[in-house]
Amino acid sequence: MDKLNKITVPASQKLRQLQKMVHDIKNNEGGIMNKIKKLKVKAPPSVPRRDYASESPADEEEQWSDDFDSDYENPDEHSDSEMYVMPAEENADDSYEPPPVEQETRPVHPALPFARGEYIDNRSSQRHSPPFSKTLPSKPSWPSEKARLTSTLPALTALQKPQVPPKPKGLLEDEADYVVPVEDNDENYIHPTESSSPPPEKAPMVNRSTKPNSSTPASPPGTASGRNSGAWETKSPPPAAPSPLPRAGKKPTTPLKTTPVASQQNASSVCEEKPIPAERHRGSSHRQEAVQSPVFPPAQKQIHQKPIPLPRFTEGGNPTVDGPLPSFSSNSTISEQEAGVLCKPWYAGACDRKSAEEALHRSNKDGSFLIRKSSGHDSKQPYTLVVFFNKRVYNIPVRFIEATKQYALGRKKNGEEYFGSVAEIIRNHQHSPLVLIDSQNNTKDSTRLKYAVKVS
């Protein structure tokens, strides 16, 4: 029984504890549900209470109904009318009345006195009426001043015109127009015109004298000594007269006489060649250049003509037959010199394939070789390297690359070596082995170039 009591007592206590827990849970659940219900009821009106506190709670419930839009229209209209009506009435009277008054005072036209350069204090009393009446004469006042300036200018020109008449001695009357702007330069030009006035007078005299004197070349020392003296003076100061003698006068060998006699002989020599240019020498210096100019082209043509026949005749024999032969030989020698092949013991020249192979078979040594010209005479493949190895003869083409002016062995391939001359190819493969490919048997061999063979 004691055991049963011990077992039943805790069981009853546990039941009581469970009942309390259930009771507490129910109470708690009831409180939570009430709180949730309260939140659901109070949540919507909480917002309008803060924004619209003046309205009653009954109105707040109505605001969330279908008439919600109508409730917001009324406060907006009242607020707009109250906000914009008051400042418009008060500010309109204060802000917009003074500006028109200031604008009326501004058109007093204060700019007119400033345009004249006068001060406002001097014309303070005459602000309104006089400026309008005086602006009209101010406009014609400007042309009046210009007219005065123009009137002064002709007066100056009239004063300067008497200075001009001594100047036209130089036969230039148009310079009077240019004298007005620059006064100092005119005075500078007066002196040279007076000193230079005698030569223009002599110039027409020389032109007139040349015509009758052309028929009488012996008259200058006797009859018209004055006129001819002027002509000699014009020729003597410029030493350019003897300059054409070495150019056109290469044939005659008599320029070593005295100066007056040489000048006479020069004139006579020119007259003997062409009588017309003799008069031109006396008339103007520009015509002398025109006379000398045709003398030069034949001299230049002779220079070009001389080297052309020289190589043809020096060769001797028939020029037509012997001419082209040295041209081919010269071209071949130039190409051979560039390739570094000329006068080499391993160079066979224009040797055909059969004779080259026979010479190598006769040597019967591995590594024997020679260089011959290709049988096709192709500029891209000018030479052929012939090598003997293992009782076989290999003909390897030597290509010439025109773009870089270099040489290469065999067909074009990637990673091939380029050389500046054929001699460099031979020197390279005398130290490093050369790969020999047999296209028939698909075999590869290598050997160095050891023995140079000559074709007998």
UniProtKB/Swiss-Prot annotation:
Its main location: cytoplasm. Associates with PLCG1, VAV1 and NCK1 in a B-cell antigen receptor-dependent fashion. Interacts with VAV3, PLCG2 and GRB2. Interacts through its SH2 domain with CD79A. Interacts (via SH2 domain) with SYK; phosphorylated and activated by SYK. Interacts (via SH2 domain) with SCIMP; this interaction is dependent on phosphorylation of SCIMP 'Tyr-131'. Residues 57-74, 173-187 have a biased composition (Acidic residues). Expressed in B-cell lineage and fibroblast cell lines (at protein level). Highest levels of expression in the spleen, with lower levels in the liver, kidney, pancreas, small intestines and colon. Residues 271-289 have a biased composition (Basic and acidic residues). The modification Phosphotyrosine is found at residues 72, 84, 96, 178, 189. One of its GO terms (molecular function) is enzyme binding. It is found in: Cytoplasm; Cell membrane. This is B-cell linker protein.
